[in-house]
Amino acid sequence: MRWMLMAIVATVVSTPAGGGDTGSIVVTIDGLRNAKGSARVALFNREPGFPDEEPAAYRTFVAEIVGAQVLVRFEQLPSGTYAVAMYHDENGDAKFNKGLFGIPKEGYGVSNNIVHAVRAPKFSEAVIPVSDGVKEIAIRVHY
């Protein structure tokens, strides 16, 4: 009996408050200049790879572009911090094309709409806290 009580206490102590909490992020992307290609959206839960290394993302989504806006929903996310990065893959090659000195050739955007002239946004600048419920964000595409 005593060991059962200890096991229950250990479980309660080791489980974070709201341990099963999950949330969602709804991303509205606007400012797309045309409906060519797709919008490639990546959700990151840590700095490495952010914003342009899609394989390093926690989750990814490829959205068909119909009209001037794209809506993407990431669901059942454990509570924590995330950042969203996207690019308009106009030529459909599934690559974020860049030119000389790494200057983007395709439209892009990140959460919190961070844009720098000389460097890519940092994860810490684009971070979004997520807990239970729905977090709605808007990303404006920059060309």
What do the predicted segments below correspond to?
Residues 80-86:
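A short tyrosine-centered beta-strand micro-motif
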Residues 23-31, 41, 139:
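A short, amphipathic beta-strand motif
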Residues 90-98:
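Acidic, glycine-anchored loop motifs typical of Ca2+
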Residues 66, 78-79:
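Surface-exposed loops/turns
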Residues 107-143:
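Extracellular beta-sheet/turn segments enriched in Thr/Pro/Gly and aliphatic residues
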